[in-house]
């Protein structure tokens, strides 16, 4: 049950701050931005990502290693339901749809994540997952961050990528999984930290 205080101006600002954390997570993981990943968690946070359970530094090491063979990653979030337990703690349930393209060389990471299933041999595979982030948020020092995350997996599927799949024109702005992505160039161009 919600109270009228759940929608006060202060609470609306809290909801917006928590939602921004979710969006920053998506950008950081999709661009493999280690500082961005670290920035959404409290230093003592615990993440339960299924095959990985541990602290923030170990999560970053696990993601960096696992994503080495993933040239494309896109996390889309929706249905962000935020419930406040206290003035400085909240529970957020966020629906997620993630598409990750595993290169033929990166399939060992896919097999480790899917119990041995990794798509057809010799071809890239797109993994599509539907899940929910169940995040315990805490405001410390005036900043909302994740204190504990559990990823609840709901469904998934895989599709092999055809060898003749369309390629983008190299002159276009094309997404990258590093600080050379167009978003970081635009951030720097207007004076935001890259």
Describe the residue ranges of each PLM region:
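Short, low-complexity N-terminal intrinsically disordered segments enriched in polar/charged residues
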Residues: 1-27, 31, 39
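Transmembrane beta-barrel outer-membrane domains
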Residues: 16, 71-73, 126-128
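Short, hydrophobic/aromatic alpha-helical segments in well-folded domains
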Residues: 21-24, 36, 40, 78, ...
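Short beta-strand segments enriched in hydrophobic/aromatic residues
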Residues: 29, 41, 96-98, 150-153
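A solvent-exposed, acidic/Ser-Thr-rich amphipathic alpha-helical stretch
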Residues: 34-115
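Short beta-strand edge/turn micro-motifs at domain boundaries
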Residues: 89-93, 123-125, 130-163, 169
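Mixed-charge, low-complexity intrinsically disordered segments
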Residues: 102-126, 175, 182
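Acidic/histidine-enriched, glycine/proline-rich intrinsically disordered or flexible terminal extensions
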Residues: 160-194
């Amino acid at each position: 049950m919600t109270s009228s205080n759940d929608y006060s101006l202060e609470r609306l600002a809290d909801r917006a701050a928590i939602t921004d954390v979710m969006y920053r997570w998506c950008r950081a993981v999709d661009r493999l931005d280690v500082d961005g990943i670290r920035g959404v968690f409290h230093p003592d946070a615990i993440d339960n990502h299924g095959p990985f359970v541990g602290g923030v530094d170990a999560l970053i090491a696990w993601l960096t290693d696992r994503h080495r063979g993933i040239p494309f990653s896109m996390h889309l979030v929706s249905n962000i339901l935020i419930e406040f337990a206290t003035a400085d703690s909240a529970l957020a349930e966020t629906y997620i749809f993630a598409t990750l393209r595993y290169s033929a060389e990166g399939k060992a990471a896919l097999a480790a994540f899917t119990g041995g299933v990794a798509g057809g041999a010799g071809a890239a595979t797109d993994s599509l997952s539907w899940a929910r982030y169940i995040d315990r948020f805490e405001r410390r020092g005036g900043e909302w961050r994740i204190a504990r995350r559990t990823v609840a997996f709901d469904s998934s599927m895989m599709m092999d990528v055809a060898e003749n799949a369309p390629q983008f024109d190299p002159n276009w702005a094309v997404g990258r999984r590093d600080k050379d992505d167009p978003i970081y160039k635009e951030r720097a161009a207007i004076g935001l930290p890259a």
